[in-house]
Amino acid sequence: MLKSVQGLWKDFFGIRDDGRKREYGSLDEVRKRSALRSRRKQMRPTGKSVLKRPRKVTDRKTEEKIRTNRRKTPKRRLTKIFQTIRDVFSNDNENMSKMQNVCGDMTRILKKRSQGRPSYMDTDTAKSRILRSDAFKRKISELKYNKQRISELRSGSSDGSSGKDRNQSLYLDREILLQRQIKKRDEKIKALESKLQSLQEALNYSNEKYRILEDLLDSSNIHPSYTKSRRTMSNLARENDEIKPLKIDLSPSPIRRTNSLFTSSPMKTYNRDGNIPEMQPLQENISPACPTPPYRSRETEKEDETLSPISVDFSSYLS
């Protein structure tokens, strides 16, 4: 209590040391420090080699004045005084009782039953719901039927009663199979009905289109014979899919053989197709001034082996 009174006294007269205060020195020292800091920032290189300009340094004296004025406002001083007086006359027992009440409430809240689960999800209600469900009854009937079938297969007795039971089970199997077949047929009928409906709609659309085209043809001044001819042509094309040209086996074009006497090419032999007929050379005079040379066969060319354009008969010189 004595310490709190001393703190109140020091706060009232402004003698108490404030840890937030910091000695910055004189005004000249502060200015020197800010100038050095700005120079260092200018000399520091950057990634893009662009010098950063120093920020505008505010006057430290004005900042200190603002802080001292804020600190010495009467409102803050009054709040401090009231806080110290409250600390002097505060009662710890009251705080402890509040904490105890809060803890007691928490324990009571934790001990309460969780409200998330409804009452119908208890075990008894769940069992009753399962027993009353249709799925459970269906499963039990299937199990009974399976057990009955297994017992019939194992026994294999030829008594009248067993025969009746067997016939009854066969009837049941047939009934199940028939029901499945009926279901499949119904599905097929539905699919065919939907398809028939779509085809009916397409047919109605085509009929309407045909009627509109007929109206357009009637309104236009076209001769009926022309329209009939066009219709017959289109019908023929539809019947034959498309009009294709006739495929006729044409004979291959003959290859004219080159003669070395009349060409500068040294070609002597060539691969000729035997199926292609060889053309006979022209034996007629083009003009009297330029008579055609005598025809020489391939054998004589092979014997002479000459490329000269002038033919010489050496047999006259041998005699």
From Swiss-Prot:
GO BP annotations, alphabetical order: spindle pole body duplication; spindle pole body localization
Which GO terms of the molecular function aspect are on file? lipid binding
Keywords from the UniProt entry: Phosphoprotein
Q: Where is the composition biased (Basic and acidic residues)?
A: 56-67
Give the UniProt entry's GO cellular component terms.
Answer: central plaque of spindle pole body; nuclear inner membrane; spindle pole body
SS bond list: none
Region entry Disordered, spans:
34-74, 278-319
Q: From start to end residue, where is composition biased (Basic residues)?
A: 34-43
Query: Record keywords: Transport included?
Result: no
**Which residues, if any, are the signal sequence?**
none
Q: Does the keyword Phosphoprotein apply?
A: yes
Q: By its UniProt entry, which InterPro entries does this protein fall under? A: NBP1/CSA1 (IPR013743)
**Phosphoserine: which positions carry it?**
251, 260
Question: What quaternary structure, including any partners, is listed in this protein's UniProt entry?
Answer: Interacts with NDC1 and MPS2.
Q: What does the record's miscellaneous section state?
A: Present with 339 molecules/cell in log phase SD medium.
Q: What is this protein called?
A: NAP1-binding protein
